[in-house]
A protein has these predicted regions:
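Conserved glycine-rich Rossmann-like NAD(P)H-binding loop of the short-chain dehydrogenase/reductase
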Residues: 28-43
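Active-site loop of short-chain dehydrogenase/reductase
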Residues: 6, 80-83, 97, 130-144, ...
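Catalytic loop of short-chain dehydrogenase/reductase
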Residues: 92, 99-105, 112, 137-180
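Conserved glycine-rich cofactor-binding loop
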Residues: 14-15
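C-terminal helical subdomain
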Residues: 181, 185, 189-190, 201-242
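Rossmann-fold cofactor-recognition segment
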Residues: 48-62
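Structural signature of the Rossmann-like NAD(P)-dependent dehydrogenase/reductase core
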Residues: 10-11, 88-89, 137-143, 186-191
């Protein structure tokens, strides 16, 4: 994948996996806009990374769309064309006691609005132009706890598990709708593993940099539609059942 005059948007980019993803894309020569919820943190992270930023709560779909439009207009004014890379690395964990029969409406809606609904908002706003231009990569951070072939069936953390299972289904469905890579548009989900982030905790076995590596690879890899695959769930550059 040539990175000449390419640009990306990374949600959740002010810390953790999103920050490391943005860092890797910048190292690959891609101009990046990060999105974070906290204004000061996003500003500080953007300064360290040497990129642009916007602050917004992605759970507010109206404001989130407005920010995505604003970023696109700003990028266009700087000479960029259609968005090349969209990485959706934002996310929240549901309350540890949120089993299906114990959780409440507020916790359910909070988790799904961020983990799943905001994925739809971003893709629905940005990906039509990418698909029409027959280009672009969308990478969505999912989780192994959302795998219905494995950990996702073990119960507990219901809003989180189900939101991530929804992400996996969303990616697969979108890939079929857009030609499974044959038209130049790629969409994939990743399981980063248990990483040392604010969500994962300091005792997690993997660093955020390790967790972000597959996302960076998917966003920048060369793709041959005759042999390579998209619309899948990946872990450490390997396809896993979803």
């Amino acid at each position: 994948m040539s990175d000449s005059k390419k640009w990306a948007i990374v949600t959740g980019g002010s810390r953790g996996l999103g920050y490391e993803t943005a860092k890797g894309l910048i190292a690959a020569g891609i101009s990046v806009y990060i999105i974070g919820k906290d204004e000061e943190r996003a500003k500080d992270s953007a300064k360290t990374l040497g990129c642009s930023y916007r602050a917004v709560d992605v759970a507010d779909s109206k404001k989130f769309r407005e920010v995505l439009i604003e970023i696109t207009q700003d990028a266009t004014s700087k000479g960029f064309e259609v968005l090349d890379v969209l990485v959706l690395a934002h996310g929240v964990m549901s309350d540890k006691m949120s089993k299906t029969l114990r959780t409440n409406d507020e916790e359910w809606r909070r988790t799904l609005s961020i983990n799943l609904d905001a994925v739809f908002t971003a893709v629905n706003q940005l990906a039509p132009a990418m698909a029409e231009a027959r280009k672009g990569r969308v990478v969505v951070y999912s989780a192994c706890l959302g795998r219905m072939s494995g950990p996702g069936t073990h119960g507990g953390l219901a809003p989180y598990r189900i939101s991530k299972a929804g992400v996996n289904a969303f990616v697969k469905n979108l890939s079929y709708e857009t030609g499974l890579g044959a038209r130049g548009f790629l969409v994939d989900a990743i399981c980063p593993g248990h990483c040392r982030t604010d969500m994962g905790g300091e005792d997690a076995p993997r660093s955020a940099q390790e967790g972000a590596e597959t996302a960076i690879w998917l966003a920048t890899r060369d793709f041959d539609a005759t042999k390579d695959k998209t619309g899948l769930l990946w872990e450490d550059r390997t396809v896993v059942d979803w």
